[in-house]
Amino acid sequence: MVRATPIHRYRNIGIMAHIDAGKTTTSERILFYAGVCHQMGEVHDGAAVMDWMEQEQERGITITSAATTVFWSGMDKSMPQHRFNIIDTPGHVDFTIEVERSLRVLDGAVFVLCAVGGVQPQSETVWRQANKYFVPRMAFVNKMDRTGANFDKVVEQLKARLGAYPVPMQVPIGAEDGFEGVIDLLKMKAIHWDAASQGTVFEYRDIPIELVDKASKARAFMVEAAAEATEELMDKYLNEGELKEQEILEGLRERTLKVEIIPVFCGSAFKNKGVQAMLDGVIHLLPSPADRPPVQGLDEKGNECRCKASDSEPFSALAFKIMTDPFVGSLTFFRVYSGVLNSGDQVYNSVKLKKERVGRILQMHSNQRDEIKEVRAGDIAAAVGLKDVTTGDTLCDQNHIIILERMIFPEPVISMAVEPKTKSDQEKMGMALGRLAQEDPSFRVKTDEESGQTIISGMGELHLDIIVDRMRREFNVEANVGKPQVAYRETIRKSDVKSDYKHVKQSGGKGQYGHVVIEISPMSDVDKQHPDVKGDFLFINEITGGVIPKEFISPIEKGLRETITSGPLAGFPVVGVKVKLVFGSYHDVDSSEMAFKLAASMAFKQGFAKANPVLLEPIMKVEIVSPEDYLGDIMGDVSRRRGILQGQDDSLSGKVINAMIPLGEMFGYATSLRSMTQGRATFAMEFDHYEEAPTNIADTVIKKT
C-alpha cells in the first residue's frame, strides 16, 4: 500500500497544560473543527470526548492520555491535508507520568495557558519535562473571554517564570466580555469568527484603529525574531527592513524546531475563537517526524545506532502505554519511528528478547477505535494481542535489532494498605491490581511479608484514590483502604565500616560454610556514575587469589540486594550505599550458594548498624497560590509542618508561596488549606528529594515499625 499522507505532512503533537487551563476543551474544539465530532463536548457537562474514563467525566480532570487522529487543511481549506496525531495529557501533578511518556513519543507540543491564571505550578513541571525531551512547542493563551484575562502579562510570565523566548503571532482584540477576535501579525489583518456557525466561518477585517500601533510593534518584534534564524534572512531584513510572509514563517519555524523561541497564539476555546488559527500555526511551525533528529538506540552488540523516519528503513517502534479495554483486552499504544508494520506481522521485543505476533492494529479516537491494516513511520496506533510488552519496550524487526532509549519512571512516594472486603473480592483484587500496575509504571503493588497485607504505592493521594476507584468500577472489586503511609528510605553516614561474618553449621550430615568480609560506605557522587550501580546500590568485588570461588560471588551480591529491600533500621529500602567484598573463606565440601547468601546478608545487617544509619524522608516541592489576606496564616501553617519557605512571587491569581515540606506533614493538607482560606487558595506539590529525618521523627517511625 502507498502512504496516504506524506510524512512531512504529519504532526505528532501533545496538548499540555496546567489543570483548568482549558486543555480538554481546546482538544474538543480541534475535533469539532477537523470534522471528527459533529457536536462539541464540554468538560463541565462531563461530555468531553477526550475524557473517556468515568472518573475523568466526574472529576472534570484528564487522567490518561487519550490519543486521537484528525486531518486539517487550514482555516480557509487552502493547504494540502495534514494528519495530526494528538495526545491530550493530564494536568494534575499526580499524573505527570502520563505527560512524561507522551512527550517521549511526540514531535511537538501545544502549551495551553489560562489568560487569567498564567503560568501555574504544574506549567513549570510540564515545561521541564518538555525541555528534557527537547520538544519544540508553541503556546496558546486560552480563556481570553474570562474576567481578569491579560495576554501581555502571560507572555511576560513565559519569559520570567519559564525562561522561554515567547514570540506573539497574534494580538488579541479586546479581552474579557469584550474579546472579539485576534490580529494576525503575518497578514496584518483582524480575524473575526462567526458565533452562529460556532466559529467555522470567519472573515478578515481591517485592524481597529486603536490597535494599529500595538500590532505594528508586535509584528516588528516577530519579524526580527524570524530574521535571527539565518544570516541571509538577517541581511535581507537589515537591508530592506521587511521580510515576505513565507520568509517569516521559515525563519520562525527553524527557530521553533531548535527550541529557541515559543510562538504564542491566543483565543477562547469555549467561545470558539482562536483554536482554528492555532491549528494553522501547528502546520506552519511545529515539526513533522522527518524534521526531528533520528531517534537514538543501541544495536544488539551495544553500539549506538539511529533510526531515520522513513518507510524504507527496518521497522522500529516504542510502546509508550498499555491500557485495558473492556472489549478487546490489552491494548499497546506505540509510536512507529521507522519502517512499516502490517497486522498479523511478527515483531521482536528487544528488551524482553521475545517474538510476538501483532493481532490487530487500531487507530484510536479517544476510546473509539477503527481497525487499520498497516502503520508506517510517524504513526501512533494501538496493537491488540501483545502479551509480554510493558511501557518503554522497543518493538523492532528481528533481523535489525535495536533498543530505543528506555523511559525512566519516578519512584512512588506514598503507600497504603488495601484489603478485599469479601472472600470473592480476594482473587479479583490480585488480578485487578496486576492489570493496573501493567498500565501505569508509577504505580506499584507488593505484599508485606510479615503482615500479609497488600501495599499499593503511587505518586500522591489522588493517584491512589483513582486506582481504588478504578478497581471498584472496572473490575467490580470492593476494598477497604488503610491510611496513607510515607515511603521512607534508609542510608548510612559513616564510611569504610568493616563487617566480618562467618555462617557455619555442622551438626551431622552436610554442613554449611560461608565467610565474607565486607566494607560499607555511603555512595559518593563519583560512585553514582559507576557502570555497576543498580537501583541506588553499588556492589564491588575486590576478591583476589580465589579466597572465595567465582561461583559464590553472584549469590553474595544477591544476598546483599535482597537485604537492602528491607533495611535493618525500620524495614524501609536502603539507598545510596556502596559495599566492597574484600575478603572471606570457603570450605571444599560445606560451602554452598545459600551459605554465602546468608553470610552476606548478616554481614550487611551488622555493618549497617555500625555505620551510623539514618532515616530519610521524602521532601515535596509545594506551591500555594492564595489571595494576599491569608498569607500570614498559610506561612505559619507551613512552618508548623516543618516546611522551609523558598520565596514568594506574584501571579495573576494572587500571591505564590514556594516551600519545601516533608510529605509526612502533607496528608489532608487540601482540607486544611480550604478551611484556612474559605476555599480561595490552591496548591500543587511534587516530589523533590530525600532528606535526613529529624531524630524525633525518625524515632517515632522506627517505634511504629
Swiss-Prot record:
It comes from the Bacteria. GO terms for cellular component: cytoplasm. One of its GO terms (molecular function) is GTPase activity. Gene3D superfamilies: 3.30.230.10, 3.30.70.240, Elongation Factor G (Translational Gtpase), domain 3 (3.30.70.870), P-loop containing nucleotide triphosphate hydrolases (3.40.50.300), Translation factors (2.40.30.10). Its main location: cytoplasm. Residues 8-290 form the tr-type G domain. Keywords: Cytoplasm, Elongation factor, GTP-binding, Nucleotide-binding, Protein biosynthesis. GTP binds at residues 17-24, 88-92, 142-145. PROSITE patterns: G_TR_1, G_TR_2. SUPFAM superfamilies: EF-G C-terminal domain-like, P-loop containing nucleoside triphosphate hydrolases, Ribosomal protein S5 domain 2-like, Translation proteins. It is found in: Cytoplasm. SMART domains: EFG_C, EFG_IV. InterPro entries: EFG_II, EFG_III, EFG_III/V, EFG_IV, EFG_V, EFG_V-like, EFTu-like_2, G_TR_CS. GO terms for biological process: ribosome disassembly. NCBIfam families: EF-G, PRK12740.1-5, small_GTP. Catalyzes the GTP-dependent ribosomal translocation step during translation elongation. During this step, the ribosome changes from the pre-translocational (PRE) to the post-translocational (POST) state as the newly formed A-site-bound peptidyl-tRNA and P-site-bound deacylated tRNA move to the P and E sites, respectively. Catalyzes the coordinated movement of the two tRNA molecules, the mRNA and conformational changes in the ribosome. Belongs to the TRAFAC class translation factor GTPase superfamily. Classic translation factor GTPase family. EF-G/EF-2 subfamily. This is Elongation factor G. It comes from Xylella fastidiosa (strain M12). The gene is fusA.
